[in-house]
Regions:
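Short strand-turn segments of transmembrane beta-barrel domains in outer membranes
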Residues: 128-131, 141, 146-176, 187, ...
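Gram-negative outer-membrane beta-barrel transporters
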Residues: 357, 447-449, 468-545, 571, ...
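C-terminal beta-signal and adjacent terminal beta-strands/loops
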Residues: 450-451, 539-546, 565-608
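Outer-membrane beta-barrel signature, preferentially recognizing the C-terminal barrel domain
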Residues: 247-268, 387, 391-393, 397-451, ...
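Flexible loop and strand-edge segments within Gram-negative outer membrane beta-barrel domains
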Residues: 192-198, 202-214, 222-303
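N-terminal periplasmic "start-of-domain" segments of outer-membrane beta-barrel proteins
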Residues: 26-53, 81
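Short acidic/polar hinge/loop motifs at secondary-structure boundaries
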Residues: 71, 99-127
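Extracytoplasmic beta-strand/coil segments of soluble accessory domains associated
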Residues: 60-99
Length: 608
């Protein structure tokens, strides 16, 4: 489907939804209904819109400073991918409103081509999750959620920011809801010349310009007391110029367009619920070897997704949950040797939950995927949570997860390998949560064993090809701490996290590339009446960039500090000022691509 035509269809349908009803009670519709069940057994880090503004440039910056992920960014705003608990980019599932949206070509998501302000909240779940969320949910999953509120009337919000390096970020959202109907429309536009310099590295971010725009539309209508029809759409268009190292270097760029549309019919009663979802997603991208010439390569992917999630309480203590999904994945490549291809993917999952008491519960799940021309493994998960005493809660999970080969892995010419088998992992996760008054501490040790790692290796014929290769053993520790305290008009919040990841190639015994052994984050917020101040800190430990742990090529440890101050006036207006990298540290997340030194921004937001 042509993206511009899709935009016309979206706005036309949006106009048909408008209506008016009487007010009754406040409710919120959340598209990803499975996440509420996941939270019964697993620790989830939720990042809300008020925290988006601290790291508003892109999703990479937000996740870097406010989650346990390591984000590999080839220069500010350029290609970016996550490493979750020592895994590779393809072992993190991106889930949009309950739908897995990892690229069929790459098997991963480009973090900087996901519009930060396109979502109402982000949730970061560590550990295996393939039974609920499918392929790639090995290291963890990132949930990009939208919600629709009822009975709130009209509301609008504007965020506008001007920042260093010719960066401008504008976001507008408008919503209306009553008893039966809710609609929300938003748009975001970001542009940056991105021409920063790092003299210590003799680096200028030449040809670093980027821009992107997105439109989001959501609507929900209560067709009966226990039934809701909901619709969510996202349209994204972006362009990233790839940095060059010399003044006369060849300037290249990458363009991406994304369309996501989801229709959901939900029935919710006392003892059962059912959510039927129909989704269409489209991902187009083009690579330009010369920014002034036609594209050199590219691809177009289309996915048709049907998913049903049925949940039933047999007794107040015993709950069964069945999830069925069918997808048609279509793709066509340009100058990649990938022809017009299609793949059918089906899955059936069953989960049973037993609530022994209000403080003790268990869950067991099984799943079988049916991927055309690929033999898929049998998956399972076993979880439990116990709250034995007031200040302590413990949870544990044992699961098998997988990632099936991508279109590029299978069909790229030359080098694609149709004989590849899925990667599989065995995961063991634990959560120890301690609560002392206003202090909450979560400590989560974990273990993973990943087999049949898919890698591209040189061949005797002179080209690179995809193979199932070695196994990887990963163990480590995640921890999070939260403290909140109010003293009259003084409000204080601290959120911190520490991650240790030992990720070892079982053949060589060496640490995997771009997996820091240590990472720590801290966010302090203080508010007094109309005035707010925050400070962010990020420590990243030694990070190897080669397979042989060569120290000379490794990224040295670094500590980055950000701060910001804002003032709210006349109840509706907030004016803020931010300083990023206060101490002017030279740092990078990918070799040869330093990130900006000290930089500034000023912003205003208006609620009306």
């Amino acid at each position: 489907m042509d993206i511009k035509k899709s935009l016309v269809l979206i706005f036309s349908a949006y106009g048909c939804f408008l209506s008016a009803q009487e007010k009754v009670i406040d409710t919120v519709y959340i598209f990803d209904n499975q996440m509420n069940k996941v939270k019964l057994f697993h620790s989830v880090n939720t990042i809300r819109p008020k925290d988006f503004e601290k790291n508003a440039t892109n999703l990479s910056e937000l996740l870097r400073f406010q989650s346990q992920l390591y984000i590999k960014e080839n220069g500010r705003g350029a290609v970016s991918s996550p490493s979750f608990r020592g895994t590779s980019a393809g072992h993190t599932a991106f889930v949009w409103n309950g739908i897995n949206i990892n690229s069929a070509f790459l098997g991963q998501g480009d973090v900087n081509n996901m519009p930060l302000f396109g979502y109402d909240e982000l949730e970061v779940k560590a550990g295996g999750g393939s039974v609920q969320y499918g392929s790639s949910a090995i290291g963890g999953s990132i949930h990009l959620n939208n919600n629709l509120e009822f009975n709130k009337g009209p509301h609008a919000f504007l965020y506008s920011e001007a920042a260093s390096f010719g960066t401008f970020n504008n976001f507008l959202r408008s919503s209306f809801s009553n008893e039966k109907f809710s609609v929300k429309v938003s748009g975001n536009y970001v542009i940056s010349q991105n021409d920063y310099e790092v003299p210590e590295k003799e680096y200028i971010n030449r040809n670093g310009r980027f821009y992107n725009s997105s439109i989001n539309i959501g609507a929900s209508y209560k067709i009966a007391p226990h039934q809701t029809i909901s619709w969510q759409n996202q349209l994204f268009d972006g362009s990233q110029h790839y940095p060059i190292f010399t003044e006369n270097g060849n300037k290249t760029k990458y363009k991406a367009q994304t369309l996501r549309s989801l229709l959901s019919w939900d029935i919710t009663k006392n003892d059962f619920s059912n959510s039927l979802k129909l989704a269409y997603t489209e991902d187009n991208f083009q690579y330009f070897g010369d920014i002034d010439k036609p594209k050199e390569s590219g691809a177009e992917g289309k996915n048709y997704i049907f998913r049903n999630d049925f949940n039933y309480f047999i007794t107040p203590k015993l709950n069964v949950n069945g999830i069925g999904e069918f997808q048609i994945n279509k793709g066509i490549g340009y100058q990649s040797g990938i022809g017009d291809i299609s793949r059918n993917v089906g899955s059936a999952a069953g989960l049973i939950r037993y609530f022994v008491t209000s403080d003790l519960r268990f869950e067991a799940g099984i799943k079988k995927d049916f991927v055309e021309n690929i033999s898929s493994p049998f998956l399972y998960s076993f979880s439990g949570k116990w709250h034995p005493i007031k200040w302590y809660e413990v949870g544990a999970s044992f699961s098998r997860n997988f990632k099936f080969p991508t279109f590029n892995d299978l069909y790229w010419r030359q080098g694609g390998n149709p004989d590849l088998v899925p990667e599989t992992s065995t995961n063991l996760d634990m959560d120890h949560e301690l609560i002392f008054g206003d202090l909450r501490l979560t400590v989560s040790p974990y273990y993973m064993d990943i087999k049949n790692y898919i890698n591209w290796l040189p061949t005797a014929a002179g080209y690179w090809a995809a193979f199932n290769t070695y196994s990887v053993e990963i163990y480590g520790l995640d921890s999070r701490i939260n403290y909140q305290k109010d003293f009259g008009n003084h409000h204080f919040t601290f959120n911190g996290g520490y991650t240790y990841s030992r990720s070892t190639n079982k053949v060589t015994g060496m640490q995997m590339m771009y997996v820091p052994l240590h990472k720590a984050t801290g966010n302090i917020d203080y508010r007094y009446r109309f005035l707010s101040v925050y400070v962010q800190g990020l420590f990243n430990g030694l990070t190897y960039t080669t397979t042989d742990e060569k120290r000379a090529d490794a990224i040295d440890p670094y500590f980055v500090l950000n701060t910001g101050i804002s003032a709210k006036f006349l109840n509706h207006y907030t004016l803020g000022f931010k300083v990023n990298n206060i101490t002017d540290v030279v740092y990078q997340t990918v070799s040869y691509y330093p990130l900006p030194k000290r930089n500034y921004s000023v912003y205003i937001n208006i609620n009306f």
